[in-house]
Amino acid sequence: MHAGLVAQALVKSILHMHIEVQMASEFMYSDPVIDEKTLVIAVSQSGETIDTLEAMKYAKNRGAKCLAIINVKGSSIARESDYVLYTNAGPEIAVASTKAYTTQLAVFYLIVARMAHSRGVFDDAQTQSFVRELQRTPEVMKKVLERRRDIH
């Protein structure tokens, strides 16, 4: 959900497009407008989240295409999706899904960069710069973590 909210802000600010982000558990009950031009992006760390799987099936039954952003290969959501982007975050040890969330954000940033380029919002140089900055994320995170004792 939260990675989707970041994606929504990116899409609105860079692409000036309207998208809706919803909890999978509420999706079917919100009377969404869905047709064959609709793309539903399902986000799940495990690829087995029942609410997400059911929301995807609901959308597909109404003509939507479904893209899954998931961590686990061969999962139910992967099998049900039209398209799959694997985050390859590895297993989550902590309750907070930090690795999966970070990789989901990276995938959304790359999707937006590609869309911006294909729609002429970004030229080649802007797209490359956008992706380069994203690639710097681990380096920047390392520097921040090295200063963790200085941060209050």
Feature annotation, model-predicted:
Residues 37-42, 49-53, 92-97:
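Glycine- and acidic
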Residues 1-42, 48, 60-74:
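Anionic-ligand anchoring segments at beta-strand to alpha-helix junctions in alpha/beta enzyme folds, i.e.
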Residues 44-53, 63-66, 114, 120, ...:
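Transmembrane helical cores of multi-pass ion-transport proteins
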Residues 83-152:
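Active-site phosphate/pyrophosphate-binding segments
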Residues 75-80:
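Short loop/helix-cap segments at secondary-structure boundaries that form the rim of catalytic
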